[in-house]
């Protein structure tokens, strides 16, 4: 198993790196050049930089990921593609994407986009909390312990 992180706006990178390096599971952070950093990563953690274009990180993750790899993303489109490839996909708020819930998530995203396109406002996501982080940590640890 390898872990791929859609890292541009991922608030749990520290949890992923800490728990995965402890378990000696390789982590690849995929992020745009606009988030470039000289910071040295721990052993087993690689950062891949991609262009800042829309979905560039998603495409790179899909090129790299294999069946049963673990992917962390908040992007429903990437989650859908990764599920079709046989990957395990987690959201940073501590839930697992499944073939049962991805259709509803994509439909909700589409309907919200149509409402915004018509000029109306939609609610954004709730703020990320410490409780969300701990929920993610517990879920993540359960998958890397397998």
From Swiss-Prot:
Highest taxon above the source species: Bacteria
Any one Pfam family match given in the protein's UniProt record, by short name: DUF188
Family as reported in the entry's similarity comment: Belongs to the UPF0178 family.
Protein name, as recorded: UPF0178 protein BCAH187_A3092
Record organism: Bacillus cereus (strain AH187)
